[in-house]
Amino acid sequence: MIPAGIGHVVLPLIVVISILLMLARPHAIPEVWWISGGVLLLIVLGLVPLRLAGQAVAKGSDVYLFLMGMMLLSELAREQGVFDWAASAAVRGAHGSCSRLFLLVYSVGTLVTILLSNDATAVVLTPAILTAVRKAKVSPLPYLFVCAFIANAASFVLPISNPANLVVFHTGMPPLGRWLSDFGVPSLLSILMTFVVMRLLFRSELCKSIECEVEDAMLSRNGKLVLVGLGLMVAVLLTASAMKTDLGLPTCLAALVITASVSIKSKSSPIKLAREISWGTLLLVAGLFVMVDAVESQGALNVTQRWLAWATGLGQSVGAMAVGFAVGIANNVVNNLPLGLIAGGTIQAAHTKGLIANAVLIGV
């Protein structure tokens, strides 16, 4: 056990070091080990009671369910060739024009991000796009950049477009109508501006032609079933969002139903899919919930609350710009999950609403 006076120093120090190690990943050790190790150390040293750690983990149940559902669906779609089919269709639809291919890849990336979350675009769609453009024998760089940037630009079109959206708003998630009212125009501008900048940046590469023909990747019956299932799932989630219902459980249940349907139809075991899910990500998020609760209990979020109050004092418009800019920079330095948890905790503790709170989410 550590004396209370020293604990006020040791606790935030352990949290900061754990997050820095998570970002640096020395010796290529996965992020989850650094965060889990930090949480375990906090508990062993008596800085965080086991009961409070359990309560902090329980707070993230909706996020865990959402992540599980989205990861399962993304892996199912990848296994059934949905992403390969989409990438191949984009290349063939370009009809020999790199410029048209750029637009099609951007459109596919936008759609995947909006409906399946930015993780699906970054982790699953990107390799499929890379394979397709290599077969077309064109420079892959513009299209890889597109996947990376649209995963951010379109990540706040809908609540389901980014797990960080659930982390930031947590129990205060706005209903769908208000979400679209608040974020519809900013997200559209984000998507359009990103396209313009990327298009100008790669204008020389996009003036070239695609000389190589690419075979069309046929979508299997199971792949079509997955597509239909995804459409139904999105409809369910939008309905749940409109009714201001938690999104985690509907996402997870929809993913399980779709997976079961495909597994029964194809007479295959879903165990392989379960193995492909990044369970470490769930542990990482759970550990971050514990750490943010721990520093909040020590009053460490008072600094961010004071800064938020200062920004609010500048007025809604100026304050929102300052907050969005600062959070955006911090997001690139740190990571959207720990930053989203800290930002969400600060918003809830300070009871911040309106334009300032929206700017925080856009920054994340």
Language model features by range: what are they?
Residues I2-L13, G60-L72, N118-A122, A153-F156, ...:
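Structural signature of hydrophobic alpha-helical transmembrane segments
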Residues T113-V123, P140-M173, T194-R199, G328-G344, ...:
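Alpha-helical transmembrane segments and, especially, the helix-loop junctions at the ends
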Residues P3, R51-P142, G280-T352:
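Membrane-embedded alpha-helical segments and adjacent helix-loop junctions characteristic
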Residues G7-I19, H27-V48, G60-L72, V124, ...:
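Hydrophobic mid-bilayer segments of alpha-helices in multi-pass membrane transport proteins
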Residues P12-L13, W33-G37, Y64-L65, S99-S107, ...:
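Hydrophobic alpha-helical transmembrane segments
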Residues V138, V157, G177-R221, L225-V228, ...:
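Juxtamembrane and boundary regions of transmembrane helices in multi-pass small-molecule transporters
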Residues M1-G7, P26-I29, L52-V63, L176-P186, ...:
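Interfacial loop-to-helix junctions that mark the boundaries of transmembrane helices
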Residues M1-I14, S88, R92-H95, R199-L230, ...:
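Intrinsically disordered, low-complexity non-transmembrane regions of multi-pass membrane transporters
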